[in-house]
């Protein structure tokens, strides 16, 4: 696996992790989903520290998805830490939270989150969200088909 093949999910609810893994499989996301239980573990993963020191086994992610309300360190703590690390300037961060609070959405945006989505109540809606993730952040752009243009060139 390479960093282009990995998505890091920071989520403390085991049921939500299982639903997310199932949605990833259903949508056919061609990425490894690595799940950690809180913001502290996510930071350790990104640092390559402790049990995450083997980058062959724990490659850097191409996308970070985080819940906000977690034990130890929150999603806000994680976003704030990522924002201070220049090596992660290009890492897209998505918040998937049960919070409907505008202040949470605003703070997540201020801390660099590219999107803030409320956790859906139904699995089908989660599958739809994963489809959006795949489209926007997990599928490389396809090269333009230049054959029609090349055929018209002298």
Q: What is each residue range found by the language model?
A:
Residues 35, 72-73, 110:
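Residue-level signal for the "D+5" position in two-component response regulator receiver
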Residues 18, 22, 77, 100-115, ...:
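Alpha4 helix (beta4-alpha4-beta5 surface) of REC/receiver domains from two-component response regulators
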Residues 51, 76-89:
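Short amphipathic alpha-helix used as the core "switch/output" element in two-component signaling
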Residues 53-65:
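Active-site beta3 strand of CheY-like receiver
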């Amino acid at each position: 696996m390479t960093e282009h093949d990995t998505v890091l999910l920071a989520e403390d609810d085991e049921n939500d992790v299982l639903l997310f893994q199932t949605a990833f499989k259903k949508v056919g996301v061609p990425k490894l989903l690595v799940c950690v239980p809180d913001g502290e573990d996510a930071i350790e993963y990104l640092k390559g520290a402790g049990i995450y020191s083997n980058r062959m086994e724990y490659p850097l992610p191409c996308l970070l998805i985080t819940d906000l309300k977690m034990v130890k360190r929150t999603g806000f703590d994680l976003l704030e830490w990522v924002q201070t690390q220049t090596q992660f300037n290009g890492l897209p961060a998505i918040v998937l939270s049960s919070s409907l609070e505008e202040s949470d959405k605003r703070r997540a945006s201020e801390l660099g989150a590219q999107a803030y989505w409320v956790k859906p109540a139904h699995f089908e809606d989660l599958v739809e969200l994963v489809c959006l993730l795949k489209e926007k952040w997990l599928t490389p752009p396809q090269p333009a088909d230049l054959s029609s243009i090349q055929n018209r060139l002298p």
